[in-house]
Amino acid sequence: MELSWGRAFWRNFLGQSPDWYKLALIAFLIANPLIFFINPFVAGWLLVAEFIFTLAMALKCYPLLPGGLLAIEAVIIGMTSAAHVREEVAANLEVLLLLMFMVAGIYFMKQLLLFIFTRLLLSIRSKMLLSLAFCMAAAFLSAFLDALTVVAVVISVAVGFYGIYHRVASARGEENDLQDDDHLDQNSKAVLEQFRGFLRSLMMHAGVGTALGGVMTMVGEPQNLIIAKAAGWHFGDFFLRMSPVTVPVLICGLFTCVLVEKLRWFGYGETLPEKVRHILQEFDDQSRQRRTRQDKLNLFVQAIIGVWLVTALALHLAEVGLIGLSVIILATSLTGVTDEHAIGKAFTESLPFTALLTVFFSIVAVIIDQHLFAPIIQFVLQASEHAQLTLFYLFNGLLSSISDNVFVGTIYINEAKAAMESGAISMKQYELLAVAINTGTNLPSVATPNGQAAFLFLLTSALAPLIRLSYGRMVWMALPYTLVLTLVGLLCVEFTLTPITEWMTQSGWLATFS
């Protein structure tokens, strides 16, 4: 029997999302205009809460859809204007270019990144050293590349290795279904469980590594670029200004990596089974024998492009997005990727998030027009200058752990800049607040997959169900890192940020505050 028109529409509306989620969104869309005409301030805060809800429920429905509907309605009923949204998008064009071109550019360097992580996995036998190597490699790469791409590469390595062992263990060849363990004997199942635990811990170490490295540079995370632009910092300035907080946090984060592996806490400590290592080593040996001169040349070319990328970013030779575009052009030209469809695949990872970021800017426009954060900012600015840094760090951290850190970082840096321009705070204090906002946005956000886009990407990937990585397990495994990164970051903002920044300024490392 064919569906009625009403039932067909209900099924189409937000697709596979649960009915309660659809009803909640409809309730939001009905309530917002009514409340707005009674009290615009309350309606504005309600919209922000609803938008954070859509981000927190990202596994139920990609936030672009419900968030986009809320943003469109906000413009229609007059919470903000289309012209203001355009201004916000124009002001953040560099971030959109970063997401469009840099992420796509790194896609064409995946072969090199896969090679690096494969060599790490098979050449280091100590699990503790391997975990440290994965965490450090992810941190270094994320300081220059997009964290999503780094995690995507590690996922590719893990899925590939999982598939190799699963195929051999099930003896089903190419017809093997990775989700089906029924064809494995008891011994193979036990080995597979250990292998899953091993991969889970490596993925979490790599994920946290992207946060440790990503906070240090202006290209590590999208919100970093927004904050750097608002403060007028280039690559070197940003790194030096963040270093009083980020360097101690990096050291303590790496120490935490070693500690949880050694003590086997929070689900860490599983080693690579020898049976699996033998199978993977055999496969890698065969792959190396099949590698042609063309393949080797591609790896060399990608390494040279990597050097260009780091140099161009460090010397600020062009806007970040344009450097990413140059990577696309060089990588495709020199490795023979000429088909339009092959090039188009590089953009599939970044464009949904780029569209979502544009919706973020619509909500930011509402926040500005309705003066939603004015009471919070006034409360913070009434505190002493020293206490302001701690409060900004904590407020950012709290919101970033449940919401997207790009959204949170954008809101707070805009408010801090407005306070500076109005004369409420000095330029010196504003630049210190920018550091507190950036570190507060990046570090505590490892608490949940909602805060870190790389974690959410891992949770929604094809790998997560294979290695039994659920939302709850991810939060539990991230807990030691959450505590260490948040507390060390807070202590550094409290005690080391101001004196070290002043020392670097007096030493001539930083430009004198204007």
UniProtKB/Swiss-Prot annotation:
It is a multi-pass membrane protein. It is found in: Cell inner membrane. The keyword Cell inner membrane applies. The chain crosses the membrane at residues 23-43, 63-83, 97-117, 120-140, 144-164, 202-222, 238-258, 303-323, 357-377, 391-411, 447-467, 475-495. Belongs to the NhaB Na(+)/H(+) (TC 2.A.34) antiporter family. Na(+)/H(+) antiporter that extrudes sodium in exchange for external protons. This is Na(+)/H(+) antiporter NhaB. It comes from Citrobacter koseri (strain ATCC BAA-895 / CDC 4225-83 / SGSC4696). The lineage of its organism: Bacteria, Pseudomonadati, Pseudomonadota, Gammaproteobacteria, Enterobacterales.
